[in-house]
Swiss-Prot record:
Its job: Attaches a formyl group to the free amino group of methionyl-tRNA(fMet). The formyl group appears to play a dual role in the initiator identity of N-formylmethionyl-tRNA by promoting its recognition by IF2 and preventing the misappropriation of this tRNA by the elongation apparatus.
Record SUPFAM superfamilies: FMT C-terminal domain-like (SSF50486), Formyltransferase (SSF53328)
Protein name: Methionyl-tRNA formyltransferase
Organism: Bordetella avium (strain 197N)
Binding residue positions for (6S)-5,6,7,8-tetrahydrofolate: S117, L118, L119, P120
GO cellular component: cytosol
Catalysed conversion reaction: L-methionyl-tRNA(fMet) + (6R)-10-formyltetrahydrofolate = N-formyl-L-methionyl-tRNA(fMet) + (6S)-5,6,7,8-tetrahydrofolate + H(+)
Pfam entry (one): Formyl_trans_N
This protein's UniProt keywords: Protein biosynthesis, Transferase
EC number: 2.1.2.9
Length: 311
């Protein structure tokens, strides 16, 4: 099938490579412009761009696809290329740009999106993190037909993935990327036979974009919620808190809620040992298992406590 692929991060790269391996013709890839990255802030191509160029595919990187937006010349150029390519389907995976109506209407069979949740739960920008944060036991991937709304299109195919008690966003991301790549290949293979299904009106939730301010843990919340949030924010933006005796916040990469309570004020360090740093919270006790001082490396609690003494 003749496709155009629109995507940007690692999640999308796996889908692009799977589509190529399945024999689909992809003459054009859309991805976001190169961004500064690393300590030197060197302009760096997206994972999708790297994969496309390695496969000899033309890449377009408009800053917007809105013909009436801030970059109309770039949008017009992209429109001209899409019209010339005349795709049967556009596959979209974490592209990062809004697709205006002209884009949605251009492919003969429409635009299919790989969304990292079981819709209608967790529509929006951060479905992986919000599913972990909420304590969901499962999530998955939905292949849907795109429309004007925010992840509101008809569903073609779903794949379910369990969320384990220790699953981080990094681990879940990689699993959903793999499942999503398999799902889009399967959906395209069965496209004529797949019956679009309306999303249920019940159970709609929105996965708000991550805010860096959320990374600072509020210890008056429950230990269970804090432990989930630490997993949800691993690796980005990375949860943090302040510990006595240290001037800078400490990143927390792994923690668990202990089956005990404490009358101490939230934030009180109860114990610091090789087993972990135990902190009183608004409800329960949070044990920190893996930490990172500002400018330092990740350390197990056992190593961390050797070089730290609570004031």
């Amino acid at each position: 099938m003749r496709l155009v692929f629109a995507g940007t991060p690692e999640f999308a790269r796996l889908a692009l490579e799977a589509l190529l391996a399945a024999g689909h013709e992809i003459p054009l890839v859309l991805t976001q412009p190169d961004r500064p990255a690393g300590r030197g802030l060197k302009l760096t191509p997206s994972p999708v761009k790297e994969a496309a160029l390695a496969a000899g595919i033309e890449v377009a990187q408009p800053r917007s696809l809105r013909l009436d937006g801030r970059y109309p010349d770039e949008a017009l150029a992209a429109q001209a290329r899409l019209v010339a390519v005349a795709p049967e389907v556009m596959v979209v995976a974490a592209y990062g740009l809004i697709l205006p109506r002209w884009t949605l209407a251009l492919p003969a069979r429409g635009c299919l999106n790989i969304h990292a949740s079981l819709l209608p739960r967790w529509r929006g920008a951060a479905p992986i993190q919000r599913a972990i944060e909420a304590g969901d036991a499962r999530t998955g991937v939905t292949i849907m037909q795109m429309d004007d709304g925010l992840d509101t299109g008809d569903m073609l195919l779903e794949r379910t993935v369990p969320i384990g008690a220790e699953t981080t966003a990094a681990v879940l991301h990689d699993e959903l990327a793999r499942v999503g790549a398999e799902a889009i290949v399967a959906a395209l293979a069965d496209l004529p036979a797949l019956a679009p299904r309306k999303q249920p009106e019940q159970g709609v939730t929105y996965a708000a974009k991550l805010d860096k301010a959320e990374a600072a843990l509020k210890l008056d919340e429950s230990a269970e919620l804090l432990a989930r949030r630490i997993r949800a924010f691993n690796p980005v933006p990375g949860a943090s808190l302040r510990l006595p005796g240290l001037n800078e916040p400490v990143k927390v990469w792994q923690a668990e809620a202990l089956p005990e309570s404490s009358p101490a004020a939230p934030g009180t360090v109860l114990r610091a040992s090789a087993q972990g740093v135990d902190i009183a919270t608004g409800q329960g006790v949070l044990r920190l298992l893996e930490l990172q001082k500002a400018g330092g490396k990740r350390q197990s609690a056992e190593v961390f406590v050797r070089g730290w003494q609570p004031a």
